[in-house]
A protein has these predicted regions:
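Active-site loop-to-helix "anion-binding N-cap" substructures in soluble metabolic enzymes
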Residues: 1-222, 226-229
Length: 229
């Protein structure tokens, strides 16, 4: 079967089985074309909770499907590839979290949404990259243990100097390989492009970015027609 034929079959079965298809923005074009909703992990889970469909197919990784199920407990949630995992979400296990909590007993544990459901059960609050600063600013406790991404955690800490942060030594393997030298090369190659950076990148990269707002939102906010991401 061709890609187009497979897509048509997916659309037919989707309607027949009363499911909606959620696709993370990182998915390939052939997946995005059959999806009902495209976005980030939390945004997709919210869309699933609002959907009238009885089931959801999450085209993403395991923690995304888990988050979807948490927000839509009455819906059936399928993960097309059960082996699809997020290295950052899986680098800290429950035993490791309990060890950290023992080291920082007076700290409020803030978990990035990119964590397993198992870890979420023993954390105090869960945040997204766009909500982390606001939520942490309203915590009564000034001591915050941020897991699992130290880069996002440090970005939040810089916005909230009145808080005392501790971090887990983790990070996204894809984002941490981007260096300041890579950024300078991109700027040299595309001098008229605005630089958009995700806060999971290293501090040296975040500091020289044009924007760290949600990437898709940034392309709408700024008038530029060229972006380096």
């Amino acid at each position: 079967m061709t890609i187009a034929e497979i897509q048509q079959e997916i659309l037919r079965m989707k309607k027949e089985q009363d499911v909606c298809i959620l696709a993370h923005a990182y998915q390939g074009q052939e997946i995005l074309e059959v999806a009902d909703y495209m976005g980030d992990s939390y945004g997709l889970s919210v869309q699933a909770s609002k959907s009238k469909c009885s089931g959801v197919i999450m085209c993403g990784v395991r923690f995304m499907a888990e988050t979807c199920k948490i927000l839509s407990p009455d819906k059936k949630v399928w993960l097309p590839n059960p082996a699809a995992g997020c290295p950052m979400a899986e680098q800290l296990d429950l035993e490791g979290l309990r060890t950290l909590k023992a080291e920082y007993p007076d700290y409020t544990v803030v978990a990035y949404i990119n964590t397993t459901s198992e870890l979420k059960t023993e954390c105090d609050v869960c945040v997204t990259s766009s909500s982390a600063v606001e939520i942490c600013s309203h915590l009564e406790n000034d001591k915050i243990l941020f897991i699992p991404d130290p880069n996002l955690g440090r970005y939040v800490a810089e916005q909230l100097p009145e808080k005392n942060f501790a971090f887990y030594k983790g990070g996204c393997p894809r984002h941490i390989v981007v260096s300041a030298k890579d950024v300078e090369k991109a700027r040299a190659d595309h001098p008229d492009a605005l630089l958009l950076v995700h806060p999971e990148c290293r501090q040296e990269v975040v500091e020289i970015s044009t924007s760290i707002s949600p990437l898709i939102k940034s392309t709408i906010i700024f008038s530029s027609s060229r972006f380096s991401i």
